[in-house]
Amino acid sequence: MIRVEKTTLAIIGLGYVGLPLAVEFGKKFSTIGYDINQSRVDELESGTDATLECSSEELAQASLLEFTTDLSALKTANCYIVTVPTPVDSSNRPNLTPLIKASETVGQVISKGDVVIYESTVYPGATEEDCIPVVEKVSGLKFNEDFFAGYSPERINPGDKEHRLPTIKKVTSGSTPDVAEFIDNLYLSIITAGTHKAPSIKAAEAAKVIENTQRDVNIALVNELSLIFNRMGIDTLDVLEAAGSKWNFLPFRPGLVGGHCIGVDPYYLTHKAQQTGYHPEMILAGRRLNDNMGKYVVSEVVKLMLHRKLQVSGSKVLVMGLTFKENCPDIRNTKVVDLVSEFKDYGCDVDFLDPWADPQEVHQEYGITMTSNIDELSTGKYNAVILAVAHNEFKAMGVSSIRDLLPEDGVLYDIKYVLPKEACHPKKHNPSIRVRGKCRWQHSTPQGFAEDRDSPSSTTDRFRRHPPP
């Protein structure tokens, strides 16, 4: 068995999860950061991280870390950590292609006595049933005799500068007791928050997938409550704050649920459940409800426009924010894009503004042309403005600057509860429509949208519907 102090690591995948891991290990161990994207490697070698997870100073501190796209360079490692995405396909079925390809990569370079650790979120059993057989086939080695494996689910929270890799407790597991001990000690060398050693790889896999599934289901509950209270003319936030005065009331809030984990991971669990012959009811119902919240937001905005006798078809709508959370460039599976198709169904012309998102990446991923320059916006140009992401730049604009984008009777819909209540009133105060314009969601922590992948359960959006007079 490898001794921790003799470990040479290879991190497979240098995205939001892999890079912070490589940087932390690279401060203490000889570490190879491997990615198939040459431009990503070039960027990191220049001391820049486009994901903004690691600063130039942090990259420089990892003096034992080198980056490469050269597969042969991985042969010097004796411990491989796989940190690739695990998405779903268009039918919401698990897509293990990145994981299988990463396993093939490991299989080409792994040697006797080596250890491979998976961090990607999967359904219980995926590591041993789907990944390890690939490593065995490609390498010609036998699992738990020639090489060993473990699973330690990632808990990276993109954009969160408070909860960083070393300060988040790590779940670890291994294919044998000795391997489990080695993996646990390896992570303890960089995780100041400590570790939790799970009794099996499957238990660790299941623990990870239910973290996000639990959040998704709870958000679905409060999303449904917000729809009910809206019909009853009750302020949802008032209800949640009152209920929250009890010590054991869970502080979930409604919101758009997208991103690359909370809106994806439940499908991994339901897929495996269905393979066992069980059809999960609550989890899938929650997914359906959460996926429809974008449609609900647009329908509410359209109602406000009609109430103000605004022409909906042909109207100009500005959506402020596109990333799946505030102050973060990550656009993966952002549910803000759902607003586009819904508004276009009503014949609206939609513009996007996001100072954090890369316009080229946005166009490539979603076919959307957007601007990142706030100064390009024209006064009074839009019939409706949707504040969808609480970027600091939007907060700095202030109420007057944002309202200047609208005509006198324009609709300002504050999803993120960034602005004070009165900001959502029409410029010409009219009590008959004042209350209809205050339909807002607020986020309760620095996390951003409820779409976030690994935020605490309380870091979701708050929906506020104000009752009619």
Which residues are covered by each model-predicted region?
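Structural/interface elements that position substrates and couple domains in central-metabolism enzymes
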Residues: M1-S432
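N-terminal compositionally biased, intrinsically disordered segments and leader/signal-like regions
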Residues: T8, D70, P446, T460-D461
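Intrinsically disordered, low-complexity regions enriched in Ser/Pro/Gly/Gln/His and often acidic
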Residues: I433-R434, S455
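A cross-taxon signal for low-complexity, glycine/charged-rich
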Residues: Q442-T445, A450-T459, R465-P469
